[in-house]
Amino acid sequence: MENKERSGIFPLLIATSYVLMIVMNALASLLPINGKTTGEVSDSYPNLFAPPGITFAVWGVIYLLLAGYVVYQFFVFSKNRDATTTFTLIRVGVLFVISSIFNIAWIVAWHFDFILISTVLIIALLICLILIALNFRNKKLTFREKLFVRLPFSIYFGWITVAVIANITILLVDIGWNQFGLPEALWTVLIILVGAAIASATMVFNKDYFYILPVAWAYVGIIFKHIDADGFNRRYPTVYFAAAIGIAMMFLAFIYSVILRKLPKHKEDQLPESDNSKDPSGEQT
């Protein structure tokens, strides 16, 4: 009885949090909240890191993928699964609900120019996504679990990584920080390169190739904004060259991760297996 109740209530809780998050994000653009769109708030804190508005179209992809995750929950909890898989999916679901609350709260704080609070909230959202990613690390997932669970959160995690960097940058603008006396362009170069290094290391550590895609997309956007005549019109070449280097770093990390995955993990993996140790049903993560 308890499992049946959970199979009905838990997906509804996930779906409700998702719908509320979508509604709040829609209102942020349609009303808009506090008379400003999300992009207009960002533009009111000029800096050299913020990607152009077109890059934020990735949110449409994220919410579409998360919709697939939400629908999938109504099927996954209606079937009998092993305890480990069920527990993993429950933890992911709980973290998703919490992350949706942080997402909603961030929208409100952002639109009312509570930049410090919004920074704390988006970092909390990032932590939720980090914990979700750790739940998938070294787990053997079915194709459906990869498609409907891991993929949505990989893209979401990657984009929020960029969003945290952008939010912190805007916070520094808000408080009038002087970048330790460094020129703004040089400071932005450092942020871009450190961000690329963190994203590359995260991808390799989590063995998650899709995570890097939205980060690279944001860096492409930074390049576009800096070379576009309606943007910075090539006034800061070091910034868009740094973004290009960042993309190259992520690509090399991707190649390294692919090669590393092909290598045998342990010497004993190369030894003949005994009859009792064979598991023909094993699936690569």
Segments from the language model and where they lie:
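Membrane-interface capping segments at transmembrane-helix boundaries
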Residues: 6, 75-79, 136-140, 254-271
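Alpha-helical transmembrane segments of multi-pass membrane proteins
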Residues: 18-35
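Alpha-helical transmembrane segments of multi-pass integral membrane proteins
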Residues: 16-23, 91, 95-106, 122-134, ...
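Short aromatic-rich membrane-water interface segments that cap or initiate transmembrane helices
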Residues: 43-58, 147-154, 177-187
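Membrane-interface transmembrane-helix boundary segments in multi-pass integral membrane proteins
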Residues: 50-56, 180-197, 224-252
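Membrane-interface helix caps and helix-loop-helix hairpins in membrane proteins
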Residues: 105-119, 175-182, 203-206, 229-234
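N-terminal membrane topogenic signal
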Residues: 2-14, 59, 213
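Central hydrophobic cores of alpha-helical transmembrane segments
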Residues: 210-222
